[in-house]
Structures are given as C-alpha cells and as structure tokens.
C-alpha cells in the first residue's frame, strides 16, 4: 500500500504544474519547486513533498519518468486559475491513493457537516480497518493537513478541526474531473450511476446527469438506461 507521506498545498502543485514543460527532464525543475515551496525547511521535507507531487500529477500519466510528458493537468493549470483547479487537484489525490479513498469514506461515516472533526476518532477508525501501522497514522495526519491547505477544514487545535462550508463545483469542473477520472483509470467509459463519489465528497456537486447531458456529443456520448448511465468518452 502506498502511503500519503507529506501534506501538500494547492499553491505548490498549481505553480509547479504551470512551470514544468513537456519534453524536459524532471530534475530541471527541482530547484524551481524549492523556490515555490518556500515554507518548507530542510532538504528532506522538500524532497519528500516533491516526490509526492511529481508521482501524483506527472508520473502517474506516463510509463517512464526520465522525460516529462504532457497531460491534462499540465494543460489545465496553464489555462485555468487556482480556484478552478483546487477541486480537480484534490480529486486526483483521492483517485490515486486507496488509503485516501478509504479516509474519505470513513470521514463521512463518522462526521456530518455540523460536527467538529476529531483526528483521534478518525485515526482509530482507520487503524481498526487497516491495522496499527505508522503508514496509516502518518497518511491520516498528512491528509488532514492537506484538507486544511485546500480550505476544506480549519484547525481548532492539534487534534480537532472545523468543517468549512462546501464550495459549489461548476459543471465545467465536474466535466474535467470526469475526464481526469477516465484518464487515471485508463478507460473510455464511465458509469456515472455507479461511480465512486468520493472524488466529489468535499464539494457541493451538481447533478451528474445534468453534466452528462450538457456535454453530450462534445466530450462524450451519453447513454442513459435503467441500470446505468454511461459516458463514452471521445
């Protein structure tokens, strides 16, 4: 199981993806990342957060890591502003890490939107299911801090968090998350009726059927039946 080793800020991700260029070597941008993530002190902290960033947002789209290849997130970050990209970047974390999908499911099983979030209660549930390992505890801590960085939570103290009001996603953001989901899972078909909704869990999401109809014939063909609602991506 791959753990979520270090908390990241959306600004670090966004600025790095704006900066990197396809066809170049990743190491050409290491120093630039260090200048972006100025809050981090020490080489080890910068290296580990950079590893998570490059693994999730660059290497996951390509077979080899020696040369950066173009991908949907590199393109979007050069076209859209940070606020537009935040939910898309957060969704990519949840798509890529099994432990974060499980975290998200447990989060909403334990807490409703009016409750304070207890890190100890959440960690206990994670350990109960996965086992008492350091990777589980570290991943839980790191993702809670990441959710604070994405303005999903606000820390009250070291163990409790306040849930901030959910931001509403636009239909265009949902469209791009669905396209990202297809690329991440190497598929041209998405059954939105049976889709794992954890990728949208931290935001107010418009009706997926409305999004499907709005983009029908443009980004996909939409097939609606009794037991499934299928997107066939172009």
Regions found by a protein language model. Give the residues of each.
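Eukaryotic partner-binding/assembly regions in large regulatory complexes
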Residues: 1-94, 105, 117
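Positively charged, polyanion-binding regions of nucleic-acid-associated proteins
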Residues: 11-20, 89-116, 170-191, 198
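Short acidic, hydrophobic short linear motifs in intrinsically disordered regions
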Residues: 26-33, 113-127, 187-200
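Short helix-coil junctions and helix-kink-helix linkers
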Residues: 34-44, 124-135, 193-206
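Short amphipathic alpha-helical segments
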Residues: 49, 99, 136-139
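Basic amphipathic alpha-helical segments that dock to polyanions
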Residues: 51-56, 140-150, 209-221
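Conserved binding-pocket/active-site segment within a compact domain
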Residues: 109-177
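Accessory, usually C-terminal, subdomains that scaffold auxiliary metal cofactors
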Residues: 158-232
